[in-house]
Amino acid sequence: MRKRVTLLVFFLVCSAAAGDVGTVTIFRTIDHHRGWKPIAFCDGQRIAAVQGGKYVKMNASAGKHTFTSNNAKTGIDLEVKPGGDYFLRVVGTTLSENGTFELVDAVQARQQVDRLEPLKADQVAGVCRSGAGGQ
C-alpha cells in the first residue's frame, strides 16, 4: 500500500512538473557558413554550438527566457507558456556575425526541422530551467 501511495505521489509531481514547461527547438538550416558554430544560450546558460543542418529540442520552464548567441546584444526574449511549442532559427548574414535568433511559425519550422538532424546528446551542454527576471 505504501509503495502505491509513493508511486502515485511521484506520478503527480512529475505530471505537475511536466505541465509547467514548454518545448523550445533551436535550429540552423544548412547554409554557406562552413565551420561557423554559433553558441546558443538560454538565460546566460550555454545550451549548444549549433551546426548547420542541426537542431536541439529542449524543455524550458514556463516564464520569460532570453535566448542569445555569442553576441548577447542580439538576443530574443521568449515568454514560454506551459505546453507551448516554440522554434528559434539561428541566422547569420556574414562570417563575422555571431548569429541572431528569429522566432519562426511552428508549421514552417516543423517543415524545416524535419529535414535536419538532432545534435548529439554530448553536444548539448544545458537546459533552460528558470525564467529570466524571476518569471
Feature roles, as predicted:
Residues 1-4:
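Positively charged n-region of N-terminal signal peptides that target proteins for export
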Residues 6-7, 37:
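N-terminal leader/targeting signatures
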Residues 10-18:
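Hydrophobic h-region of N-terminal signal peptides that target proteins for export
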Residues 18-135:
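Short loop/turn and low-complexity linker motifs enriched in small/turn-promoting residues
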